[in-house]
Design a protein with these regions (language model features):
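Short Asp/Glu-rich motifs
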Residues: 37-39, 181, 199
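Terminal-tail/helix-coil boundary detector
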Residues: 191-199
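Conserved beta-strand edge residues that scaffold enzyme active sites
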Residues: 32-35, 176, 194
Length: 199
């Protein structure tokens, strides 16, 4: 399989972590999304022109949620909980992150560089952080469910982003945030992202 990723693409990193969880090896092709020629080249691999995209033989799967579902099938369900109810919750949480938290995306952009912590949080970010805290409080610890899965892969990148801007959650939510920050798959993903930057 070949995974088409973008430099500093959070969704590429989330899919990469899911691949590690599923014990699937990728050949990685890195796209520099700030380079117009390189970005135009994405359409060679992705019908949407977006990353990540997965190429498996003649099959092309685009969009991170679809890719994760494909990886989950290849790995006999390894990325989601065994319980049907928990699987539904896990998919809901992944979808919520996929489509939401726009204030954090716009005002706390993902970066591998050191950034200044936010001194104040506007109403939009405050509301989103409150929702994240509610989600994180549900964690069974050290993962969201009884084993590491797609939800942890998705929200670990968010935990990293929050921490970079000095947003540290409290109580059980804070315990889950710290657990994600300590998670070796997240740390490996950050190293991988830095390696992508040099390509």
């Amino acid at each position: 399989m070949e995974l088409i990723v973008g430099k500093e693409s959070t969704w590429s990193l989330r899919v990469w972590i899911c691949g590690q969880l599923a014990n699937i090896d990728f050949n990685i092709k890195v796209i520099d999304l700030t380079d117009s020629d390189d970005k135009a080249h994405v359409f060679t691999f992705s019908p949407s022109g977006l990353v990540p995209a997965l190429v498996d033989g003649s099959l092309v799967v685009h969009d991170s949620l679809a890719i994760v579902e494909y990886l989950n099938e290849q790995a006999n369900g390894a990325l989601f909980p065994d319980s049907v109810n928990e699987r539904a919750i896990a998919r809901s949480l992944c979808s919520e992150l996929h489509s939401g938290f726009m204030n954090l995306r716009e005002q706390c952009s993902f970066t591998l560089e050191n950034v200044m912590p936010l001194s104040t949080l506007n109403d939009g970010i405050t509301n989103e952080v409150s929702r994240i805290e509610t989600i994180f409080e549900q964690a069974q610890l050290p993962y969201m469910f009884d084993k590491a899965g797609a939800v942890d892969a998705f929200y670990s990148i968010l935990a990293y982003r929050l921490n970079a801007y000095g947003i540290v959650l409290n109580g059980r939510a804070g315990d889950y945030q710290q657990s994600l920050l300590d998670w070796h798959f997240l740390q490996d993903a950050i190293k991988e992202a830095k390696a992508w930057e040099s390509k």
